Amino acid sequence: MLRWAEGKSAIVLARPGTCHPVRLDGAMGDRHAAPMNLLLLRNAQVHAPEPLGQQHLLLGGGRILWMGAELADLPAALSVQTIDLQGRRLLPGLIDAHVHVTGGGGEAGFRTRVPPQGVSRFTRAGITTVVGLLGTDDVARGPQDLLATVYALREEGLSALAFTGGYHLPPRTLTGTVRGDLVFIEALIGIGEVAISDHRSSQPTLDELLRLAADAHVAGLMTGKAGVLHLHLGDGPRGLELVRQALAQSELPPRVFHPTHVNRRKALFDEALALAAQGCTIDLTAFPVEEGEDAWSAADALLRYLDSGTAAERITISSDAGGCLPVFDAEGHVCRMGVGESGALLETLNDVVRRGVPLERALPAFTSNPARLLRLADKGRIRVGADADLLALDAAGAAHDVIAGGVVHVRAGRVEHRGTFENEN
């Protein structure tokens, strides 16, 4: 039950089981602070990811302040915006750990550079947290632009982080070393996407890969950040051999290595399953797969993973949004290309659920699993004290309401908050 205490100059929310009440009249000890904007979500079927049944949630200061099945009348003096979700499913906001926030591409000339996308492209897809990175083009695009774009997305209300480096070695950095970038720049949480088994890579050696992974690991220890090495996997026949050698010949923990695109070839996915059994977290990419192609869709791969008996927390799914999806001929020329879309994450989740997988079993790959790997303690779950990043689905599984940092970005399927240069088209 939500309990209130009303004094002469403050309204206090008392959370049962907590030691300290939460003041709703502004910052502690600052009588001139503006009141906290409060949002009450009523009648939500909460999947946290586990199902919690129908709950009411009070949001404020970017956090979930309270959650419960019973709700008392609110004090008349308290200004609260209310949204009745009418029994809709409420999920943690999706976490996309592989996004080309500055735009990717460039493999077929400068005209093929993908432009960056605005904040509403993410939020209308139910995504509230992104990790930006550089890919093939880490020359014309650099870490300064990447970091500036991350900060711009934050100013627009999205949670945004980034990996330092890119496809190639030596990695481009801001401080001169990847370890320095992770230690001294708050938004940088790992290294990536470093390309292996790909004709576009720098053909890194085992020693070079180990040095990068060690820098990521030590920086993670020093800062409490993710400290992961996010690895782009190409179509090369060597597959994950370098990672297997790294695990066999070093003391580095498997969690440091986070290979992505592992569903691009069926044999590569089998290799990735074996790595997950050793303790690595593997990442599927939600790209389109044509009939007869030697690849698994992200939905197919997730189903196979869940049926394999491998630890359910060691798989994540990302979109590669903003990245170019090229197809090459035998000479390495681009035959055709597409662009990764943020909406592919929610489409994949719905596809898996339609095939009979319970939502609470499918959802962690999009929420709590990436939050755990990236050490984002306040994300990926619906609980009191967590960030107020939430996604309410309509009956068809589309994003009906999206809340990022306690702010409504999508309401009843309509975008309420757009980026500075976004139009309504």
Residue ranges of model-derived segments:
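Short, positively charged and aromatic/hydrophobic N-terminal segments
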Residues: R3, A10-V12, P21-A27, R31-H32
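C-terminal cap of metal-dependent C-N hydrolases
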Residues: G61-I64, R381-N425
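Metal-associated gating/positioning segment near the N- to mid-region
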Residues: L74-A77, L85-A148
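Divalent metal-dependent hydrolysis catalytic cores, especially in the metallo-beta-lactamase
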Residues: Q117-G142, A148-P170, I185-H199, L221-D235, ...
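His/Asp/Glu-enriched, well-ordered alpha-helical/loop segment
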Residues: D307-L393
